């Protein structure tokens, strides 16, 4: 195989809610090849670990540890490929860093922090949910940035801050010293007006961030050059550019989802399940708001009309709980793959759970809470772990199928197929049951869709790559294995 003439590799920093990674991507024989260089853990940390006076329930991200891991990963990447031309960053949405005179104020708070729920009534006393949806087109979620900022107004640091940067923009700032806000992620904050594509001045003023938001840039724009001191640390040239990826991880994932056509839905399945369709214009109807859908911005001016639903969080939290028990009892670790294999042999459960139930929002004791929900619904709590996993899988598949059809209906077309990407696309039982319940084919893959989208946007932005990566999805189809699942009929409960 030969590398494309004149094409340099790029580095993608892909930060997820449970893990992060640094990946090298390059074009080889017209296909994108990804090399995982560094993977590291991520997750919520009690704020009290950083601030002894904080509430015991308050949650944060260890952003300094993430930055340390990113630097380590980039050093490894440049050791492997000194000719890396650019770096791009994507991450989860809504969370932010506050800065004053170039110094971060406190920690980056976690979107699952319970303070957000308490702030909802205060903001809605000024703007109704219907009015907010008309402005920003977003599904109501208590962790949206606007509610976090309303909660922040009760604390000192927002008034002291002179800059607010969303997580990927903060990492870009650390890399370049340039403060910019990439627009796919800006659209998740609730502060961006869907009709104008600019900051909503009234909301911005009401929430105390006037003059604190960075200029908006678009995917593929240059953020700036890598800082000289970091270039020396990584062994990189001074010409390395930091390029704005579609910095909301879902936007990067959707950019790399090889949709079959305009009547396709996508499910970006990780900790969250982002179920939606790609449209040219936002859907700002009462029906869309009532159904809980959101309008987020995507690559090349597209609209990601989608609904945030629970994804594999219920599975990972259940396994985490069981492994805590196993450690206390000096027993072997529980492996999700083993439980999924056992679950596939079990019948369709009689009683399902609602994965969107607020009882499942916070981490901790997940199997206990699932069992309680099943009892409350009139069912019998599962006796074994595999049985509980089977209930979760069936519940997720039912949720995915229903929301994919609803997205298509509200978008004005009949659903023809579903593409599942991300880590959840590896779950054979989940993909098959989604196809069965939706009664349409499911195409699974790619797994590393977010990193792939990040890489493709960067490659397209480079002068030598502009004509080679014009159709991102065609490149994806050439580059990865996709698995098809045909619906086989809805099985009746045993």
Predicted stretch roles:
Residues 84, 211-213, 415:
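Core-facing hydrophobic residues within beta-strands of well-ordered domains
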Residues 1-106, 134, 160, 215, ...:
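N-terminal glycine/serine-rich phosphate-binding loop of ATP-dependent small-molecule kinases
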Residues 103-115, 188-191:
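A charged helix-plus-loop insertion that forms the helical arch/lid used to bind
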Residues 2-5, 11-12, 24, 124-136, ...:
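Active-site core segments that coordinate phosphate-bearing ligands/cofactors
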Residues 90-94, 219-220, 269-272, 417-425:
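Glycine-rich beta-strand-to-loop/alpha-helix junction loops that act as flexible
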Residues 109-128:
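Short alpha-helix plus adjacent loop in nuclease-associated cores
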Residues 177-186:
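Enzymes and membrane/adaptor proteins characterized by extended Gly/Ser/Thr/Asp/Glu-rich
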């Amino acid at each position: 195989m030969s590398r494309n003439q004149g094409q340099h590799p790029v580095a993608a920093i892909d930060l997820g809610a449970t893990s992060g990674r640094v990946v090298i991507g390059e074009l080889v024989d017209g296909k994108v090849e990804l090399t995982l260089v560094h993977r590291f853990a991520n997750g919520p940390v009690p704020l009290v670990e950083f601030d002894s006076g904080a509430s015991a329930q308050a949650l944060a991200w260890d952003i300094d540890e993430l930055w340390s891991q990113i630097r380590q990963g980039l050093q490894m990447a440049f050791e492997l490929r000194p000719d890396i031309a650019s770096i791009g960053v994507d991450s989860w949405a809504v969370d932010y860093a506050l800065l004053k005179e170039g110094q971060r104020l406190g920690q980056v708070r976690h979107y699952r922090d319970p303070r957000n729920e308490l702030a909802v009534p205060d903001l809605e006393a000024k703007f109704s949910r219907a009015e907010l949806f008309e402005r920003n087109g977003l599904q109501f979620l208590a962790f949206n940035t606007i509610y976090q900022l309303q909660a922040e107004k009760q604390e000192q640091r927002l008034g002291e801050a002179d800059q607010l940067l969303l997580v990927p923009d903060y990492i870009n700032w650390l890399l370049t010293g340039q403060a910019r806000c990439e627009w796919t992620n800006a659209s998740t904050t609730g502060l961006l007006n869907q009709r104008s594509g600019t900051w909503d001045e009234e909301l911005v003023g009401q929430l105390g961030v006037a003059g604190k938001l960075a200029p908006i840039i678009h995917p593929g724009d240059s953020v700036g050059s890598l800082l000289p001191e970091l270039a020396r640390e990584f062994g990189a040239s001074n010409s390395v550019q930091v390029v704005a990826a579609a910095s909301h991880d879902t936007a990067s994932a959707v950019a790399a989802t090889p949709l079959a056509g305009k009547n396709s839905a996508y499910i970006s399945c990780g900790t969250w399940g982002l179920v939606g369709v790609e449209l040219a214009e936002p859907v700002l109807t009462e029906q869309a708001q009532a159904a809980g859908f959101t309008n987020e911005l995507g690559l090349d001016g597209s609209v990601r009309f989608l609904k945030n639903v629970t994804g594999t969080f219920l599975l990972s939290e259940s396994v985490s709980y069981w492994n805590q028990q196993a450690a206390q009892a000096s027993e072997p670790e529980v492996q999700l793959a083993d439980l999924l294999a056992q679950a596939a042999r079990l019948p369709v459960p009689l009683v399902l759970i609602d994965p969107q139930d607020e009882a499942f929002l916070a981490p901790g004791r997940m199997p206990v809470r699932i069992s309680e929900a099943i009892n409350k619904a009139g069912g019998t709590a599962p006796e074994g772990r595999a049985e509980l996993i089977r209930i979760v899988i069936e519940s997720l598949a039912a949720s995915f199928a229903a929301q994919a059809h609803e997205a298509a209906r509200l978008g004005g077309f009949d659903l023809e197929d579903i593409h599942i990407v991300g880590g959840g696309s590896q779950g054979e039982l989940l993909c098959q049951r989604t196809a069965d319940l939706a009664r349409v084919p499911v195409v699974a893959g790619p797994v590393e869709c977010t990193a792939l989208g990040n890489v493709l946007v960067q490659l397209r932005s480079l002068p030598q790559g502009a004509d080679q990566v014009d159709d991102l999805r065609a490149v994806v189809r050439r580059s990865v294995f996709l698995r098809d699942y045909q619906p086989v009929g809805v099985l009746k409960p045993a």
